[in-house]
Protein backbone atom coordinates (compact mmCIF):
# COMPACT_ATOMS: atom_id res chain seq x y z
CA UNK A 1 0.00 0.00 0.00
CA UNK A 2 1.07 3.58 -0.57
CA UNK A 3 1.64 5.43 2.66
CA UNK A 4 3.92 8.18 3.99
CA UNK A 5 7.60 7.36 4.45
CA UNK A 6 9.32 8.01 7.78
CA UNK A 7 11.16 11.31 7.98
CA UNK A 8 9.85 12.51 4.62
CA UNK A 9 10.13 16.23 3.80
CA UNK A 10 6.74 17.97 3.62
CA UNK A 11 6.88 18.88 -0.09
CA UNK A 12 7.77 15.30 -1.08
CA UNK A 13 5.11 13.96 1.25
CA UNK A 14 2.58 16.17 -0.53
CA UNK A 15 3.68 14.78 -3.93
CA UNK A 16 3.20 11.24 -2.60
CA UNK A 17 -0.23 12.22 -1.26
CA UNK A 18 -1.34 13.29 -4.73
CA UNK A 19 -0.01 10.03 -6.20
CA UNK A 20 -1.95 8.09 -3.53
CA UNK A 21 -5.09 10.07 -4.45
CA UNK A 22 -5.33 7.91 -7.59
CA UNK A 23 -6.14 4.89 -5.38
CA UNK A 24 -9.86 5.00 -4.47
CA UNK A 25 -9.80 1.66 -2.58
CA UNK A 26 -11.12 1.73 0.99
CA UNK A 27 -12.62 5.21 0.56
CA UNK A 28 -9.18 6.60 -0.33
CA UNK A 29 -7.49 5.03 2.69
CA UNK A 30 -4.00 5.44 1.13
CA UNK A 31 -4.52 9.19 0.66
CA UNK A 32 -5.98 9.56 4.16
CA UNK A 33 -2.84 8.01 5.68
CA UNK A 34 -0.99 11.25 4.75
CA UNK A 35 -3.35 13.36 6.89
CA UNK A 36 -3.64 14.07 10.59
CA UNK A 37 -6.24 11.91 12.29
CA UNK A 38 -8.65 14.83 12.49
CA UNK A 39 -8.21 15.86 8.85
CA UNK A 40 -8.61 12.24 7.69
CA UNK A 41 -11.88 11.97 9.63
CA UNK A 42 -13.20 15.27 8.28
CA UNK A 43 -12.23 14.69 4.64
CA UNK A 44 -15.39 14.03 2.64
CA UNK A 45 -14.36 14.77 -0.95
CA UNK A 46 -16.74 15.61 -3.76
CA UNK A 47 -17.79 12.50 -5.77
CA UNK A 48 -16.37 14.14 -8.89
CA UNK A 49 -12.61 13.66 -9.32
CA UNK A 50 -10.57 16.48 -10.88
CA UNK A 51 -7.93 15.53 -13.46
CA UNK A 52 -5.11 18.06 -13.89
CA UNK A 53 -2.25 18.11 -16.41
CA UNK A 54 0.32 18.34 -13.60
CA UNK A 55 0.60 19.93 -10.18
CA UNK A 56 2.94 22.73 -9.17
CA UNK A 57 3.70 22.78 -5.45
CA UNK A 58 5.02 26.09 -4.11
CA UNK A 59 6.03 26.80 -0.51
CA UNK A 60 3.91 29.57 0.97
CA UNK A 61 6.49 31.25 3.23
CA UNK A 62 4.10 33.95 4.46
CA UNK A 63 1.66 31.45 5.91
CA UNK A 64 4.43 29.37 7.48
CA UNK A 65 4.79 31.30 10.72
CA UNK A 66 1.80 29.59 12.37
CA UNK A 67 2.93 27.29 15.19
CA UNK A 68 5.69 25.56 13.28
CA UNK A 69 3.40 24.34 10.51
CA UNK A 70 4.07 24.45 6.79
CA UNK A 71 1.86 25.80 4.01
CA UNK A 72 1.92 25.09 0.29
CA UNK A 73 0.10 26.53 -2.69
CA UNK A 74 -0.88 23.82 -5.14
CA UNK A 75 -1.80 24.71 -8.72
CA UNK A 76 -2.68 22.91 -11.91
CA UNK A 77 -4.71 23.19 -15.11
CA UNK A 78 -7.88 21.13 -14.96
CA UNK A 79 -8.26 19.04 -18.13
CA UNK A 80 -11.20 16.87 -17.11
CA UNK A 81 -13.39 15.30 -14.46
CA UNK A 82 -14.34 11.73 -13.63
CA UNK A 83 -17.87 11.07 -12.42
CA UNK A 84 -18.58 8.62 -9.62
CA UNK A 85 -19.22 5.93 -12.26
CA UNK A 86 -15.96 6.68 -14.09
CA UNK A 87 -17.29 8.80 -16.97
CA UNK A 88 -14.64 11.22 -18.21
CA UNK A 89 -15.64 14.75 -19.25
CA UNK A 90 -13.20 17.24 -20.77
CA UNK A 91 -13.00 20.49 -18.83
CA UNK A 92 -10.96 23.66 -18.95
CA UNK A 93 -10.11 25.45 -15.76
CA UNK A 94 -7.66 26.11 -12.99
CA UNK A 95 -7.18 24.25 -9.75
CA UNK A 96 -5.69 26.24 -6.90
CA UNK A 97 -5.54 25.25 -3.25
CA UNK A 98 -3.69 25.98 -0.06
CA UNK A 99 -2.52 22.98 1.95
CA UNK A 100 -1.43 23.21 5.58
CA UNK A 101 0.83 20.64 7.21
CA UNK A 102 1.74 20.02 10.80
CA UNK A 103 3.99 17.59 12.64
CA UNK A 104 2.50 14.59 14.43
CA UNK A 105 5.05 12.72 16.56
CA UNK A 106 7.84 14.22 14.46
CA UNK A 107 6.26 13.28 11.10
CA UNK A 108 4.69 15.76 8.67
CA UNK A 109 0.97 15.27 8.01
CA UNK A 110 -1.64 17.25 6.07
CA UNK A 111 -3.90 19.11 8.50
CA UNK A 112 -5.97 21.25 6.13
CA UNK A 113 -6.93 20.56 2.51
CA UNK A 114 -9.84 21.06 0.07
CA UNK A 115 -12.72 18.57 -0.11
CA UNK A 116 -11.79 17.26 -3.53
CA UNK A 117 -9.80 14.41 -5.06
CA UNK A 118 -7.24 15.74 -7.55
CA UNK A 119 -5.09 13.47 -9.70
CA UNK A 120 -2.53 14.14 -12.38
CA UNK A 121 -3.05 12.92 -15.94
CA UNK A 122 -0.14 10.44 -15.66
CA UNK A 123 -1.66 8.89 -12.52
CA UNK A 124 -4.98 8.46 -14.33
CA UNK A 125 -3.14 6.57 -17.08
CA UNK A 126 -1.11 4.49 -14.60
CA UNK A 127 -3.83 3.66 -12.09
CA UNK A 128 -7.05 3.58 -14.11
CA UNK A 129 -8.07 1.66 -17.18
CA UNK A 130 -10.80 2.48 -19.68
CA UNK A 131 -13.56 -0.12 -20.05
CA UNK A 132 -16.75 -0.09 -22.07
CA UNK A 133 -20.28 -0.67 -20.86
CA UNK A 134 -22.77 -1.56 -23.59
CA UNK A 135 -26.34 -0.27 -23.81
CA UNK A 136 -28.95 -0.56 -26.57
CA UNK A 137 -29.55 2.59 -28.56
CA UNK A 138 -33.15 3.78 -28.45
CA UNK A 139 -34.43 1.73 -31.42
CA UNK A 140 -33.18 -1.46 -29.75
CA UNK A 141 -31.30 -2.50 -32.90
CA UNK A 142 -27.69 -1.86 -31.97
CA UNK A 143 -25.40 -1.54 -28.96
CA UNK A 144 -23.72 1.72 -27.97
CA UNK A 145 -20.51 1.74 -25.95
CA UNK A 146 -20.18 3.88 -22.83
CA UNK A 147 -16.54 4.36 -21.84
CA UNK A 148 -15.64 4.35 -18.13
CA UNK A 149 -12.31 4.79 -16.38
CA UNK A 150 -12.04 2.28 -13.53
CA UNK A 151 -9.35 1.84 -10.91
CA UNK A 152 -7.10 -1.11 -11.76
CA UNK A 153 -6.82 -2.04 -8.07
CA UNK A 154 -10.39 -3.36 -7.86
CA UNK A 155 -10.96 -6.80 -6.36
CA UNK A 156 -13.45 -8.02 -8.96
CA UNK A 157 -13.81 -6.17 -12.23
CA UNK A 158 -16.88 -8.14 -13.33
CA UNK A 159 -18.83 -7.14 -10.20
CA UNK A 160 -17.95 -3.49 -10.75
CA UNK A 161 -18.92 -3.56 -14.42
CA UNK A 162 -22.26 -5.26 -13.71
CA UNK A 163 -23.06 -2.81 -10.90
CA UNK A 164 -22.41 0.11 -13.29
CA UNK A 165 -24.41 -1.60 -16.06
CA UNK A 166 -27.46 -1.77 -13.78
CA UNK A 167 -27.02 1.90 -12.84
CA UNK A 168 -27.46 2.78 -16.51
CA UNK A 169 -25.64 4.87 -19.10
CA UNK A 170 -23.73 8.11 -18.57
CA UNK A 171 -25.90 11.23 -18.42
CA UNK A 172 -25.04 12.48 -21.91
CA UNK A 173 -25.66 9.05 -23.46
CA UNK A 174 -28.94 8.31 -21.66
CA UNK A 175 -31.34 10.10 -24.09
CA UNK A 176 -30.03 8.01 -27.01
CA UNK A 177 -30.42 4.66 -25.27
CA UNK A 178 -33.29 2.40 -24.28
CA UNK A 179 -33.71 1.04 -20.79
CA UNK A 180 -34.12 -2.75 -20.77
CA UNK A 181 -33.66 -3.38 -17.04
CA UNK A 182 -36.30 -2.43 -14.45
CA UNK A 183 -35.31 -0.14 -11.58
CA UNK A 184 -35.79 -2.92 -9.01
CA UNK A 185 -33.26 -5.19 -10.75
CA UNK A 186 -30.39 -6.11 -8.47
CA UNK A 187 -27.09 -7.96 -8.82
CA UNK A 188 -26.72 -10.60 -6.12
CA UNK A 189 -23.11 -11.49 -6.84
CA UNK A 190 -21.24 -14.44 -8.29
CA UNK A 191 -21.60 -17.85 -6.70
CA UNK A 192 -19.68 -20.86 -8.04
CA UNK A 193 -19.18 -19.01 -11.31
CA UNK A 194 -22.88 -18.19 -11.69
CA UNK A 195 -24.02 -14.55 -12.01
CA UNK A 196 -27.16 -14.02 -9.90
CA UNK A 197 -29.78 -11.32 -10.48
CA UNK A 198 -33.11 -10.57 -8.82
CA UNK A 199 -36.02 -8.23 -9.58
CA UNK A 200 -36.20 -9.23 -13.25
CA UNK A 201 -39.33 -11.40 -13.21
CA UNK A 202 -41.43 -8.77 -15.05
CA UNK A 203 -38.99 -8.42 -17.96
CA UNK A 204 -40.12 -9.51 -21.43
CA UNK A 205 -38.15 -12.21 -23.26
CA UNK A 206 -37.03 -9.51 -25.68
CA UNK A 207 -35.60 -7.34 -22.90
CA UNK A 208 -33.98 -10.37 -21.26
CA UNK A 209 -32.24 -11.18 -24.53
CA UNK A 210 -31.14 -7.55 -24.86
CA UNK A 211 -29.79 -7.43 -21.31
CA UNK A 212 -27.96 -10.71 -21.97
CA UNK A 213 -26.28 -9.08 -24.99
CA UNK A 214 -25.34 -5.96 -22.98
CA UNK A 215 -23.87 -8.19 -20.28
CA UNK A 216 -21.93 -10.48 -22.63
CA UNK A 217 -20.49 -7.57 -24.61
CA UNK A 218 -19.52 -5.67 -21.44
CA UNK A 219 -17.81 -8.67 -19.80
CA UNK A 220 -16.11 -10.08 -22.91
CA UNK A 221 -14.79 -6.67 -24.04
CA UNK A 222 -13.22 -6.28 -20.58
CA UNK A 223 -11.40 -9.58 -21.11
CA UNK A 224 -13.51 -11.61 -18.68
CA UNK A 225 -13.72 -15.06 -20.29
CA UNK A 226 -17.08 -16.67 -21.07
CA UNK A 227 -19.30 -18.54 -21.44
CA UNK A 228 -21.37 -16.94 -18.67
CA UNK A 229 -23.97 -18.67 -16.52
CA UNK A 230 -26.58 -16.05 -15.72
CA UNK A 231 -29.54 -16.67 -13.42
CA UNK A 232 -32.36 -14.18 -12.81
CA UNK A 233 -34.83 -14.89 -10.00
CA UNK A 234 -33.62 -18.52 -9.79
CA UNK A 235 -34.11 -19.32 -13.51
CA UNK A 236 -31.87 -18.81 -16.56
CA UNK A 237 -31.93 -15.13 -17.64
CA UNK A 238 -32.82 -16.19 -21.18
CA UNK A 239 -35.24 -19.11 -21.32
CA UNK A 240 -33.60 -22.29 -22.57
CA UNK A 241 -30.06 -20.88 -22.34
CA UNK A 242 -27.99 -22.20 -19.44
CA UNK A 243 -24.93 -20.36 -20.74
CA UNK A 244 -24.48 -17.12 -22.68
Identify the residue ranges that each predicted region occupies.
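Bimodal "functional hotspot" detector
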Residues: 1-244
